[in-house]
């Protein structure tokens, strides 16, 4: 009877240990997935920021081009 109790205790102990190891690995996997999602979100935010900067630069380029064109036209065709 004592041998059976010890065997049962050993089986339960090993089962609990393996279960806790599996839970720990599962938590680590979930944390890694969460970090990857955050990195993807950051990448999307960075892309939006870059697009916004490109749009601003494009608008600035248009304004500078118009001003430059006006200066060149005034230089070539001065008003008297």
From Swiss-Prot:
It comes from the Eukaryota. Residues 1-22 form the signal peptide. InterPro entries: Frog_antimicrobial_propeptide (IPR004275), FSAP (IPR016322). Keywords: Amphibian defense peptide, Antibiotic, Antimicrobial, Cleavage on pair of basic residues, Secreted, Signal. GO terms for cellular component: extracellular region. It comes from Boana raniceps. This is Raniseptin-4. Belongs to the frog skin active peptide (FSAP) family. Dermaseptin subfamily. Has antibacterial activity. Residues 23-49 form a propeptide. Expressed by the skin glands. It is found in: Secreted. One of its GO terms (biological process) is defense response to bacterium.
């Amino acid at each position: 009877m004592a041998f059976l109790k010890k065997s049962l205790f050993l089986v339960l102990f090993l089962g609990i240990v393996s279960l806790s190891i599996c839970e720990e690995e599962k938590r680590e996997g979930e944390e890694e997935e969460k970090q990857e999602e955050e990195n993807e979100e950051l990448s999307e935010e960075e892309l939006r920021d870059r697009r916004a900067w490109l749009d601003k630069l494009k608008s600035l380029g248009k304004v500078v081009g118009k001003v430059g064109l006006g200066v060149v036209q005034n230089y070539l065709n001065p008003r008297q």
